[in-house]
Structures are given as structure tokens and as C-alpha cells.
Amino acid sequence: MSLSPDLPPSEEQNLEIQGSATNCYSVVIIEEQDDTFNDQPFYCEMCQQHFIDQCETHGPPSFTCDSPAALGTPQRALLTLPQGLVIGRSSISHAGLGVFNQGQTVPLGMHFGPFDGEEISEEKALDSANSWVICRGNNQYSYIDAEKDTHSNWMKFVVCSRSETEQNLVAFQQNGRILFRCCRPISPGQEFRVWYAEEYAQGLGAIWDKIWDNKCISQGSTEEQATQNCPCPFCHYSFPTLVYLHAHVKRTHPNEYAQFTQTHPLESEAHTPITEVEQCLVASDEALSTQTQPVTESPQEQISTQNGQPIHQTENSDEPDASDIYTAAGEISDEIHACVDCGRSFLRSCHLKRHQRTIHSKEKPYCCSQCKKCFSQATGLKRHQHTHQEQEKNIESPDRPSDIYPCTKCTLSFVAKINLHQHLKRHHHGEYLRLVESGSLTAETEEDHTEVCFDKQDPNYEPPSRGRKSTKNSLKGRGCPKKVAVGRPRGRPPKNKNLEVEVQKISPICTNCEQSFSDLETLKTHQCPRRDDEGDNVEHPQEASQYICGECIRAFSNLDLLKAHECIQQGEGSYCCPHCDLYFNRMCNLRRHERTIHSKEKPYCCTVCLKSFTQSSGLKRHQQSHLRRKSHRQSSALFTAAIFPCAYCPFSFTDERYLYKHIRRHHPEMSLKYLSFQEGGVLSVEKPHSCSQCCKSFSTIKGFKNHSCFKQGEKVYLCPDCGKAFSWFNSLKQHQRIHTGEKPYTCSQCGKSFVHSGQLNVHLRTHTGEKPFLCSQCGESFRQSGDLRRHEQKHSGVRPCQCPDCGKSFSRPQSLKAHQQLHVGTKLFPCTQCGKSFTRRYHLTRHHQKMHS
């Protein structure tokens, strides 16, 4: 697996590594070395030669030093991360965290280390996935384990390589320590992948085989992937990929390796992560879903099949449909070019090469000669070079107007008018229809790149005829609620050249607010404020909401909506509820009322987590959360994980929200500066709903209504057991669990149950050891934010809870409450045997131990 050639017999070396405090790249200083270690010499990647002191051509080896952090420091593994490196979610599926390069390109021959850890026994090393073996000679070994964060460094997060093409680090032993050597240049954004040197493993034997197998098995094998594991036919080990299995058989079962390669050829194994194959399938489904959108027929390529019939395929399409490969007769083509990594098939070999280059290898062979920016496809390079040409024209003639087309509805600009039209059609459809109506779009643009609207009630309306015919005479105004698309679905070739253009029905869209509807009737009942020419809302008194419900004071724009309202007067509806005598004008409203109020029935069930809902809208909102999680997992597994490093300390995060919370908690003086820097980004989302009492803003009206100040004093949900009132129904349900003893949230590891889900989340941190709340002054970590706040009060000396009687201050309200009992004289803890009462619980416990035990 290693790129290094076989080494000559190891020689005695007198080397010690010392890092420089000012420069990340240091050299090796010669000192006396312990000759009891069975070390390997250094290796020069440039001249492919081994050396002991220094290379005759390139000098001594270079090292990247760790950031200084004393042993025993909490989270030392993160604090030792060198400058330019960050830790984030690994691009290998289910591999956990990984190390990424965010600085300059790491050159060949750069060394990292040594690997820090705690020396453990052989039995513990065989059960750990973070152990390395140190060979001391004469079959004597020591084991370094990085399980504890207080004794390890950042090298514990480097994941194992799945193939030789992925490997960019080589692990070897030098001076009784494990070092990593860069065997391939590591560009910015790439992840560190390590594999051991062959000469290092030769003298370790079966013990190293078991330890390394534990590393490979722990990386990527979960219960969900148990069916995809590759078991070894000669022992009980199982591996997540065939590459790991081949390395294991070659190392542990060398006599059976020749027979094994015949039955399990490595060439057919796709070392692509499983989620990457799923991503390809999702891309195929998305390509199929785009068939309902209009696309152009020119420019096209005519691909002749064996039958001599033409197959049309759009030239600019990045990936044709993998699941639908058609000939002119509707049959599947005989010549299929299949991808060995994900199984997708293509009509032409060039499309297969482009797919492998853009999806799997991430190769970008097309580079700009001016700015050195690279692209995976030639079309992207052409579009990019067009920007340079426009810049040169503007420099040569400053008075010449720039060919930049800004969008009037947002801040984006485009170098081509057709790109602006496509942007308007997708994101500002109302403005796009206005341009079509005013004639700003040319006939060529309408024909090739747009959707056009027809009104079948218009006497001048003519359906699309055979061939390619301009449709500009058939355009209708903005008020047209129905649209038909001129074009053919993507990837579906016509049966012959004279085939009629397909007519695709699109959902009606309101031209004022750009909201889409399922049918025309819903669009007609929809009412929204009209806009003037500048885009501002113009209220018309005659169109205001004039129909008001007498019970709930809710206003409606027309009488039909008011009649369909649930709060209509008794006797006005045709459908009566048998439980509460409420009348409804529609049967569906009555059924929904019975289901949500009386029967508590939840017929809408999620197929993923089996959670049930009373209404279909709740199920749809819930399913969106699963889709977001799935797309996030697929994108994080297929592409390099997004890393958000903190600019004020060495911590890094995989989500920008976590980074902002970290800055707000540990760098409060920088939080406002960070927010101003993020203007227009994710964190500066518009929040139009503001609370006048606490000045807190919300992005949605639902979040504003659920705010505590909104319902302050309004407690409408009473507990039937103790009479306590609540403002929210969910709060009442959680409170009733105290009376019923129900604990629905159970820990899967120890079986302990909890009333609230938040209690379970905090409890799970006791199993994982996670302490995400870090004190910025002493470095101590805590599982809960409340523990951190109480701890920070020790540093600040602030005691916010003050007794109004004597003025004594306390850091916790519980301590103040117990102190106030001394002034009142209340003794809440009586003894059940003698009747004596006490003000403190520990006083009662001490009384039991002395008097009654």
C-alpha cells in the first residue's frame, strides 16, 4: 500500500526532532539516540533515497510542529492542531472526524508528529482503534494509545486510506515514535489519508495485523452497513471495503492471497463510499424530475444507433439520464457504457468519462491561463474566460458600456442576457412574465429558453404545430393563470423529426406574489395586494378583507372563505359534530375537527421514524427535516466537508451556527464584528417580527406567536390533577408525566428513562464523554450550559441571588431558597420515626445516621 520502496536493513540512528516556535517547518537536530528501538531511516520523496542524517541533495527532513499544549490539558487533541489544518467531518462515510488542509499546499517529504498518546498494555491495545505499536527489538513491543484527549494530539483524527490513490501520508517509526510523512502533495481542501510503510509492518507480525484491522473495521462499519461488509474467508474479521480486505489477506494470509485475488478481483471493487453511489442515484432521480421542465432542442447532437435512427441529446446537459437510455424505437440501446463505481450507464463513452471526472475523481483538467482557476468541464472554462474578455474590453475602452446584465429584483448580475432570463424565469417568474408581455424577450430567446403562456379562451390562440414554430404571436398577458411549456422532456428523444411538440401543463402561478397553486379554482380564490410599477404594495379599499367572523374576529377576503370557516354560527352549517354540537359547512372540516379535538387520531404516519400527525401538513413539514438530513449526509459524504474555523482560537466547526454560538459564548467582544462580517449570509436572515417587550426578533410569525412574551399572562391549559396552568398544550403534556410517571425517552445504552428529551440528550453525554461547553479562562469543560454559567461565576465573583432580609448573596437560586427558610423558620424535612424537623436535608440524613441507625 505504501509508495516507498523496500528499505535496506535498519541502522542505528542518532536523531531527535525539535520544533521551532516561530516557523512551522523545522529541521532535525542530531543527538544521542536510544539504540533499543528498531527504527527505519528517513526517506526522501524527491530523489527516492533513504538517509540517516540528511539527504545529500535536499538536506535534512522538514517538520510541521504541533501547537503547544501541555499534557493533561482538556481537549489537548484539538489544541495541538498545527496552523493551517482543521478538523471536520470526514468525507469517508461513517468515518467520524478527519483532518483537512486549509492552508498552503503541503509539499512532498513534509513530516508530522510524533504521534502522542498513553502507553498501555497489549490487551487494551487489541481492543482499541487508536493504538500504534512501537518495536523495541528482540520481539519487545510497546503500545501507544490516543483514546484520552488529554494525552493525545491531532494525529488521532487522521483516517486510514482506502486505496493507494487516496493515500497522501506514510506512517513509520523513528526514534521510538510514530511519524507521518507526506508522500503526495496535499492541496487546500484535501483530507489527510494515512497508510503504514511496509518496512514498518514487517517486524511487527500478527499483533500489528490485529491492531490495524481494528482501525479499518472501526472506520466506516456501522450496523446500517452490516450487509455491505466484506468478510474474510480465512478468519473472523470483516471490513467495510474490498480494498481493506485485500490488504488484510495479503498481510495475514499470504499463502492464500493468490487464490483470493482470483475469486475477489480488486478491479471490480468500487472504493467509492456507499453514500456516493446513493448520491448518483439521487442525481438520476433529479434528472428524471426535470423532465417536466421545458428545455431547448438546440443545440443538439444526433447520435446514431445500430438501427440508424437518430437520438437527440442536449449538448449542454452535464449528465444524461442514467436510468432511461432510449433508441428511436423506444428500446434500450445495445451499446451501454457503465460506470464501475456507481453503476450508472451512458450512451457515449465521453459522457462516462465526464461523469467519472466530475463525480468520482473530482478532476479539473480545464484551467484558465490568466488566473489559474480550474474547471471540470470545458463549458465552465468558456463561461469563465468570457468574464476576462469583458474585463479587457472595459479596460481598453472605459467609456464603453459594460455587457453586464443586473437583475432588477435582487443583487445578482450576469454576463449574458440568456443567463439573466433563465434566472428571472426560475426565481422571479412574475417579472419574467412581465418582460414576455412587454416584448423585451426576443423570439429566439422565447423559442429556446423560456416558458410561454397561452390562453385557450383567446380566439387567436393556436396550438403548437409540427416542427419548430415561433410562438410569440400566441403570447398572453400577465393574468394568464395556465401555462404550457414548449419543448420536450429532457433525455426523451422524439420518435421522428416531424413529431408534435409536447404540451406540458404547469401549475398556475399568481403574477403578483409568484405563489403557485394546484388548480385554477384555488388561484381564483387567492387574493394578494397588487403592486405598482415600482414593486410597492398598493392597497385598494374595495379589495380589503371585509368579511369578518363574529366569533374569532378573523377577516376574509371573500364570502366563500368566510362560509367555509370553522367558527360559523350554529345552524348555518350542514354538518354537525355529535360531540360538541358545532356546525361545519364542509365534511372535511368536520372530520378534521373530530380527529384533532375529540378522537386524537393521528392517521398521517412518517415512514422513516413512524411519528404520527393529525394533519397532512404536519407530516409534510416533518418529512422536510428528513430530506434536509439526508441531503446533508449525502453532500458531506460525497464532497469534502465544509469547515468553519474560529478566527480567534484553534477550534473548528462543521456548521456555521455552531461557530457563531462558540464566538458569542467565548469571544463576546468579537460577536458583533462577526455578525457585521457575515452581512448577507446565513446569520443575517431578515427577522421582521419583533417583540416590543423583550426586543427579540423572529423570522416567522409562528415563532413570534410561540414566544413567551406573546402569551404572557394567558394560561389556558389547566392540569386536572394539581390545577397548575400553562400557556402551551405541550407544556401541559410534559407536566402531566410527573403525575403519571411516564418516561418515554429511554437511553439505548443503559436503559435509563427520562421525562424530557433534553434530559436524555444530556445523559447521553455521560456515555460519549462529550463536554461541549468550555470555560474560556481555565479550559475546564462541562456537559451542560448551566454548569458552565455557575462555574464562570466563580471566576467573576458575581452572586446574582441576594437575600432581601439580610443581604447575603448566593450563586444559585436553590441556595437562596434554602437560606430564606432560616428567616421564616420553616422546617420542611421531618423525621418519620421521631417527628423532629430540620431545615436542611443533609441535617435529616445526619440525624438518621446518629440516632436511628
UniProtKB/Swiss-Prot annotation:
Polar residues composition bias: residue spans:
291-314
Q: Where does Zn(2+) 2 bind?
A: C407, C410, H423, H428
C2H2-type ZnF: 230-253, 337-360, 366-388, 405-428, 508-528, 547-569, 575-598, 604-626, 644-666, 689-711, 717-739, 745-767, 773-795, 801-823, 829-852
Q: Where is the SET domain?
A: 83-197
| Residues binding Zn(2+) 3 | C747, C750, H763, H767
PTM (free text): Mono-methylated; automethylated. Tri-methylated; automethylated.
Q: Pfam families under this entry?
A: PRDM2_PR, zf-C2H2
Query: Which locations, inside or outside the cell, does it occupy?
Result: Nucleus; Chromosome
Sites where the protein binds Zn(2+) 1: C235
Superkingdom of origin organism: Eukaryota
Residue spans of biased composition, Basic and acidic residues class: 450-459
Give the residue ranges for region: DNA-binding: 755-845
Q: Name one GO biological process term.
A: male gamete generation
Family, per the entry? Answer: Belongs to the class V-like SAM-binding methyltransferase superfamily.
**Domain remark text:** The C2H2-type zinc fingers determines the hotspot localization through its binding to specific DNA sequences. Variations in their sequence affects affinity towards DNA-binding motif.
Recorded protein name is: Histone-lysine N-methyltransferase PRDM9
Question: Gene name on record?
Answer: prdm9
